[in-house]
From Swiss-Prot:
UniProt keyword terms in alphabetical order: WD repeat
Keyword Membrane: no
Organism name: Mus musculus
Tissue: Testis-specific. Expressed in spermatogonia, spermatocytes and spermatids.
WD repeats (start-end): 421-460
Protein name, per record: WD repeat-containing protein 93
Ranges where the record places region Disordered: 1-35
Biological process terms in GO annotation: electron transport chain
Manganese found in the keyword field: no
Matches recorded under PANTHER family: NADH-UBIQUINONE OXIDOREDUCTASE (PTHR12219), WD REPEAT-CONTAINING PROTEIN 93 (PTHR12219:SF17)
Length: 695
């Protein structure tokens, strides 16, 4: 039995209406009371705290805030402890070899069994299997800052770019190195253009270079006569006789200028199938045929007003409807443009009062495609399979992807044959091997996936809000067989996989299969507490199915399995990079061999890194995946046949018997229903027959 005081206190707590219980209003609104609504709201049970005088009210709020914040920190620490308990430290693998350099390399490229490293006024060629330098060329006017290498069958096309922006073409055939041409080198330095970007088709049939000079930007496309080069090297004497009067190469390297280096590094175990070291020599007396100029492309001009006075005049004089509905070929009068600009300035005048920054030059992204259906080709033009036939290009800040046919001559006009418009400006694009798949990334974070070989749109997927694409990489399609990633050794269609690195350092896996549409999966989330773990670069590893290399700001390198979203191992190499600057890793992954090379630095007289890059020696560290126990089996057993896939999908006998039994039950039910329907139909027909007889 409770006391009287307790009952009184309970009544006071339950009394939340200031004026007693509310009366039931009459049905008509006119009879409702005119009292203020605040008289009927619930009282705040914590109002007594807000009624405290100052400074006690402020002290109470500060104490509450401090207590809540302390509780949040305690919860975060507990969650981190749980993660650390479950965290498995990955195996750390060290490099198997090291290439010591005199200075920081100006780019690296891998092709066939060779490694190319840009350096002091030239580049060096290394044997990829034993890391021995087999040739060095140092006759440029400036240091090389980037270098590319492309397979041309059994030969290699080498394209270095120096600090002056001059791009050169070299051809490596067996044990001979040839200089083909310096694409943009001129005698007058004031007219010298700079190469900003370049792209070579998959088989080396075409090359495109983006140049900048005299306040202008343009793209030049060349056809590479690689078949003619082979014939000229097979019959060098006839070639020399025909080109005896030609101008001598400006770049000549005498044999005495070529020096061999003695490597102090210990090489890895050389496999039995590795190539033998070649004595490469520079052939300065033989001049190969020059690349053939195809076309020059400039950025699209801004839309100007038309002189047509009416739409009828436009339809009467415009015969071509190419680009209809694509945002091109607009006919807008000058008056309309003036009205549009006046409205714009009136709306955003306060934002435009400051100083205007100089508009940057247009930059372009371009790719070579092998699908004829992207352009309208003439019937008499035939394109060989495996040869690039279309160039796709999009300019910064533009909504359109333009397609140009490569089956042109210098007399033809440089006009696009097709255009793909997008709802938002295209900020990035990427193609897969032999341009089978195309990915377009728009400014609004939308990713568009195309199967160009079949002319099929996989669909559109939107990245999470606030995520913007930093880089995108296609992965070769793989299967998970008995817990291991494997490549199918048979053709696969309508299957695409790619990894997307966003600007917030999150990593996503985007997959699409047939008509199901693309889906996105988070592999690595955005770092919140430890920003040094943020991802700065990603690289697929073709030798390991479903594996990607992840480079973090902390200068760590890990290998991730995208199927499980798990880190398998880490790679350790000495690095010497200032902590204040963001790390831009310089690396190269072999597309045909299980090799991976990373630039690093050794401090002088030490084995640990230092923050002073001037007190360190540059090196390129060599990693062979097959030398590591965890990755050896994955690299050697990376393919699976279609028969093995079908056999693994076969059901056991018990499952098959159960399926047959279930089907027989369903058939029995269907037969019973059919008999019932037939009996009802017979009864109904007999009843109708009796009714007819009565009439």
């Amino acid at each position: 039995m409770s006391s009287f005081k307790g009952n009184q206190a309970q009544k006071r707590r339950l009394s939340v209406f200031p004026k007693g219980p509310l009366e039931i209003p009459s049905p008509t609104e006119a009879d409702w009371p005119k009292d203020d609504e605040k008289d009927f709201v619930f009282k705040d049970l914590d109002q007594e705290l807000d009624s405290l005088p100052q400074p006690y009210r402020m002290i109470n709020k500060l104490v509450d805030h401090l207590f809540n914040r302390s509780w949040e920190i305690i919860e975060e620490r507990d969650s981190l402890r749980e993660v650390e308990k479950n965290w498995i430290v990955p195996a750390i693998y060290h490099p198997v070899a090291e290439i010591q350099l005199d200075k920081m390399p100006g780019g690296m490229a891998v092709s066939h069994d060779y490694l190319f490293i840009g350096g002091l006024k030239g580049f060096s060629i290394y044997n990829l299997h034993n890391c021995k330098r087999i040739y060095v060329l140092e006759k440029f006017k400036a240091d090389v800052i980037s270098i590319w290498a492309t397979d041309l069958g059994n030969d290699v096309l080498i394209v270095p770019i120096d600090e002056m922006g001059i791009v050169r073409l070299f051809y490596l055939c067996k044990d001979s190195l040839y200089h083909i041409k310096a694409i943009n080198e001129v005698d007058d330095s004031s007219k010298q253009s700079t190469c900003l970007k370049m792209e070579i088709s998959q088989n080396g049939d075409f090359a495109a270079f983006l140049f900048q000079g005299a306040g202008d930007v343009w793209l030049e496309v060349y056809k590479l006569p690689k078949e003619i080069w082979l014939k000229e090297m097979e019959h060098p004497q006839s070639t020399l006789n025909q080109k005896k009067k030609a101008k001598q190469l400006q770049l000549s390297t005498p044999d005495s200028a070529v020096t061999e280096s003695i490597e102090t590094s210990s090489g890895p175990s050389v496999s039995s199938n590795s190539v033998q070291d070649l004595n490469i020599s520079f052939k300065s007396d033989l001049k190969l045929s020059l690349p053939v100029f195809v076309m020059k492309i400039k950025p699209p001009k801004p839309i100007a007003g038309t002189t047509f006075k009416s739409p009828l005049e436009v339809f009467a004089k415009v015969e071509d409807y190419v680009g209809l509905g694509s945002g091109q070929n607009h006919f807008i009068k000058d008056v309309q443009w003036e009205q549009h600009m006046e409205t714009f300035y009136a709306s955003y005048k306060k934002h435009l009062e400051g100083e205007w920054e100089e508009e940057p030059l247009s930059m372009a992204t371009f790719h070579f495609f092998y699908t004829n259906s992207l352009t309208t080709m003439s019937m008499d033009v035939k394109s060989s399979s495996g040869i690039a036939c279309v160039l796709g290009i999009h300019w910064n800040g533009r909504h359109n992807l333009f397609f140009y046919s490569l089956n042109k001559t210098q007399k033809d006009k440089t006009e696009y044959e097709n255009v793909w418009p997008c709802a938002a400006p295209i900020v990035m694009s990427q193609i897969s091997s032999f341009s089978s798949y195309l990915a377009l990334v728009c400014e609004d974070g939308v990713l568009i996936l195309w199967d160009l070989a079949e002319g099929f749109l996989f669909g559109v997927v939107a990245l999470p809000e606030g995520c913007f694409c930093q880089s995108i990489h296609f992965l070769r399609f793989f299967l998970v067989h008995e817990g291991q990633n494997v490549y199918p050794d048979y053709p696969v269609k309508f299957e695409v996989m790619c990894v997307v690195l966003c600007t917030d350092a999150s990593l996503h896996l985007v997959t699409a299969s047939g008509t199901q549409g693309p889906t996105s999966k988070v592999l690595v989330g955005r770092p919140v507490m430890h920003m040094e773990e943020a991802i700065c670069a990603v690289a697929p590893v073709p030798a390991l199915p479903g594996m990607v290399l992840i480079f973090s700001r902390s200068q760590s390198v890990t290998l991730m399995d995208v199927a499980k979203a798990e880190v398998l191992c880490a790679f350790s190499a000495p690095t010497c990079h200032p902590q204040a600057l963001p790390w831009k890793p310089l690396f190269a992954v072999s597309p045909h061999h299980p090799y991976f090379l990373l630039h690093g630095a050794h401090p002088h007289g030490q084995t640990t890194s230092t923050e002073d890059p001037k007190k360190s020696t540059d090196s390129v560290f060599y990693f062979n995946f097959e030398d590591y126990l965890l990755l050896k089996d994955i690299s050697k057993k990376c393919t699976i046949s279609q028969m093995a896939v079908n056999f693994s999908q076969m059901l056991p006998v018990e499952k098959r018997c159960e399926q047959v039994f279930q089907k027989s039950i369903q058939m029995t039910k269907t037969q019973m229903k059919g008999r019932e329907q037939w009996s009802r139909l017979r009864k109904y027909s007999i009843m109708l027959q009796k009714e007819l007889l009565k009439r």
